Structure formats: C-alpha cells, structure tokens
Amino acid sequence: MILVNVHAGNCDNTLKNFKKRLQRELYFRKMKEQRYYETPSAKRVRKAQEAARRQRKFARKKMFDE
C-alpha cells in the first residue's frame, strides 16, 4: 500500500508524489502486464529479452567507465 501525506491541502504536490511513488514501485508496468493473459512461453521470452537488454546496458556503461 502506498501512503502519501497531504501537507496544508497541497493536492498538486501530493498527486505528483503519488505518481512518482507508483512509478518507482513499477506499479504501472505490473498493471499493463496483468491486463491480458500472457502464456508461460511468452513470459519466458519477454524475461529473456529484458535480461539481455539489462546486460547490454551494463556492458555499455562498463565500456564507457573504463
């Protein structure tokens, strides 16, 4: 559960903080993934692609750090 404090009736900042916390906890991604049923084979493929993307990103970052 996500809790956000409202200070002095400032709804704009509260809404902004709420959206930021939702994004930080990957809430929107989970909602999007659960919208339709994903077969186990498609899930494995997607997770493998995400892992490969992370590895490429890490390799690129490591290459520029050296």
From Swiss-Prot:
Belongs to the bacterial ribosomal protein bS21 family. The gene is rpsU. This is Small ribosomal subunit protein bS21. InterPro entries: Ribosomal_bS21, Ribosomal_bS21_sf. GO terms for biological process: translation. GO terms for molecular function: structural constituent of ribosome. Keywords: Ribonucleoprotein, Ribosomal protein. It comes from the Bacteria. GO terms for cellular component: ribonucleoprotein complex; ribosome.
